[in-house]
């Protein structure tokens, strides 16, 4: 019999005091690979429990796919940190933790006595992982930040990726949060590794704004005034006409991608039936294309050429000629994508009442480590009794704390 594979983060305990998407997603991935994550919610619960109302997805206890993305496998409790008994119970939890993960704003943490300085003094080995909208310093440190504001609006893409003059594009809910969670996860893992050699915890932080800048790093550099990059792009004047999007005869679009214009120019010129441009000095370089505005003529011709065939034919033709391309797909396509299913990037999860949903999975895999299977996240306070029994509380003490509102 094949030996059971272990998970790489077994033995790590994380106490999470966080809501919505980015921070809980980081701890969700820690949990998927073996960490024990105890999620502490308020009396009314993480607002992510109700996000389905906004996205038209069911959001009931034991049948809450959106909440499950971020919280599968976690142990769930609810503590009132303003209640003395609740605060004491929370500190007792922290005594057992390797990581404290939170996105509560720093001033609020200070008022609760949960600031880094206080906790580092009490628990010097604790990794204190803090997530925010705009970062822990500067004039906007205490400003509330969301995916749409701090990631998309503040770092530029909401304005600069749109078609000129159009309404700002609207990304799906929490796209930037999910991207940023990977940066947060990386920082936490580095802090855990560092603790193994030093024995000391640290304050590790990231923010939606930091991630927005990092994800958009090429644009942030190339659009500084000394370089002159400009966006939004004119659809007739892309940087490279062979790295652009074209509409096909069936009304669907395809993206063609070439990262070495000068080397690939003869190939593309012949593929698209315009061999003469390979020797045209106006097409000799990307600089020449734009200095002469010859790019407009090429794109206009390519627009007409692509409208002679449906997208499937273009996709087959370009792939046969080793051209990187992809039809523009919709989000609806992903849940049935054979490539995604074959690689385990999405998997079927059955919720209460036999509701089946194709759920996105953490985007990393190992040959020698296991990953915790997807399970439906439970109701508010689902694991309170077992969590506090593990801390040494008796059943009468747990009942008394529930009666006082300290826990739920």
Spell out what each predicted region is.
Residues 242-321, 325:
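Aromatic-enriched alpha-helical interface/lid elements that frame and gate functional surfaces
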Residues 168-179, 199-203, 233-243, 254-255, ...:
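A short glycine-threonine-serine/GTX helix/turn-capping micro-motif
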Residues 1-200, 379, 385-408:
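N-terminal helix-loop segment corresponding to the beta1-alpha1 unit
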Residues 37, 319-333, 394-399:
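Short, well-structured beta-strand/strand-turn elements
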Residues 67, 232-238, 244-245, 293, ...:
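Short Gly/Pro-enriched turn/cap motifs at secondary-structure boundaries
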Residues 174-189, 208-216, 260, 264:
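Mid-domain beta-loop-alpha active-site segment that forms a flexible
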Residues 1-13, 247, 270, 333-408:
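Terminal low-complexity tails and localization/encapsulation signals of metabolic enzymes
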Residues 192-233:
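Substrate-binding/catalytic subdomain of NAD(P)-dependent oxidoreductase enzymes
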